[in-house]
Amino acid sequence: MKNLSAFVLLCLLATALLPHSVHAQKRAYRAPEFAYNWGKPGLHPDHIVLNMPEDPSTSMSVTWRTSVDVQAGYAEIAIATAAPKFWRNAKTYKAHTEILEATDIPRAEVVSKYHSVTFTELLPDTTYAYRVGDGRIWSEWIHFKTAPDGDQPFSFLYVGDTQNYIMELWSRLIRAGYQKAPEAGFIVHAGDLVNYAHDEGEWHEWFMAGSFIHRMLPSVSTPGNHEYYPRTEEERAQRIRSLSVQWEPGFTLPDNGPAGLKETVYYLDYGAMRLISLNSNVRQEEQVPWLEEVLADNPQKWTVVTYHHPLYSASSGRDNQQLRELWKPIFDKYQVDLVIQGHDHSYARGRTEPDKNQLAGLNMRDQYVGTAYVVSVSGGKMYNMRPDGWDDFKGATRDRGAENTQLFQVISIDDDRLSFEAYTATGQLYDAFDLEKTAAGKPNRFIERQDEAIPVRTHDNTISYYDQLPDGVTEKLEAQHPGFRVISVTYYDEPEFRGYRVLLSDDEERLVLRTDPEGNVVK
């Protein structure tokens, strides 16, 4: 009897631990709610973020936010030492202050002050401590390290779209990235930092989720399509989408891009790398002459480009052909090494063939490679991968993909080698490859390392991202509506409604149905 009881208990425990779909489909997600004034500015500095100027080995910029009651802003900086009174050697900077008046802009509904300082005449590869405030109310002292001077090794983090579930889910991802690469020099954010461009609450989530990481590791941010949205009903009527009202006052990014694209198109040099941000949302053709100039006059060994919309899409139903035809020839001409992108809410990593005029006879399976392209996602919103990989894209191949997986990437450069590693939010190595410089003017040598990583992750072998209808209900609904297929299911457990919201589509028309928990259609 004792053995039988133990067996029954073991079976029950095993059943409870299984990620059983029946258990999952009956659980409605309880999204956090934030108080209306949760993200409003106050007397204490918040939204503190570091950004790098054109030369981050000798300068660094910091920006922060306060209420309009704060009259002025100041920043103090000193070389950090183990002695706690390093501040005796601090230098004080008066901040540039501007007011953001956005009380009439939907979702912003705020008036605040932004303060910014650019520290200059810094020493390369040196740890500094700084603080910001109004002369009476100060932040904590915060460390950062300037860029190395020359060919010293360095690493940085790269993340794709944050956008959704920022505080509740992106926070764990960015903290895992910092934990994996605490010595990283900076973080590249490849667009869609928020979901609604002007939403003050979402921007507050972004700053809270990153917390001290934004204050210690400089952010290199490029705008995504969700950083653009109409500010007024007039703009909406004219289909005008404006850059987030928080972007320019909230960041201090290099101002060396084309006119009219301030702090969205720019470049900076870090160690032996030139890093270029492009704006894939607007005025793409106007960026071409500037890009040609920046690439033609490039003394750095490595070149990395970031922007939002991928040239080679990762997800189903997407293709940015015009952008690919516009920018890829330039990347090829100047042998851009790596392009890091977002937008598609899945992961794809691949490469293009080298210019055959440089090394005739090479093909995609040779060890030499043209530009390597990566698309990644760091937030909690997920899409499906393209089922055909990159087979539709001439001259490109996808080597690795992922669905339903939050990822961060660590990119390291050491002399003639660039190492790329993608990690899951739980710190597992998901993808890896190296690029190795060869003779001048020749393509990079490509070294595949995905055999070091965990198996491919898809919607089929991970905890379901989508809610699931009870067995047989999908087939029943599709039979009742010929030509339509179920494309999304959301389970609700609210006082006013408990059951499923089902979206069906025939590619031209959409149909929304509601069912009870058993799958019976209700009005």
Language-model regions, residue ranges each:
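Short, non-transmembrane alpha-helical segments in secretory-pathway proteins
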Residues: 459-488
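An acidic-aromatic substrate-binding cleft motif
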Residues: 112, 137-190, 195-196
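Extended active-site neighborhood of metal-dependent phosphoesterases/phosphodiesterases
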Residues: 109, 113-119, 127-143, 202-299, ...
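Exposed beta-strand-loop-beta-strand "reactive/processing" segments of non-cytosolic proteins
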Residues: 483-515, 521-523
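Active-site-proximal segments of metal-dependent phosphoesterases and phosphodiesterases across multiple
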Residues: 298-341, 357-360, 391, 396
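Acidic, histidine-bearing metal-coordination/catalytic regions of metal-dependent phosphoesterases
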Residues: 22-158, 414, 419-458
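Bacterial Sec-dependent N-terminal signal peptides
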Residues: 1-26
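Active-site neighborhood of phospho(di)ester-bond hydrolases with catalytic His/Asp-centered motifs
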Residues: 158-160, 186-192, 218-225, 278-279, ...
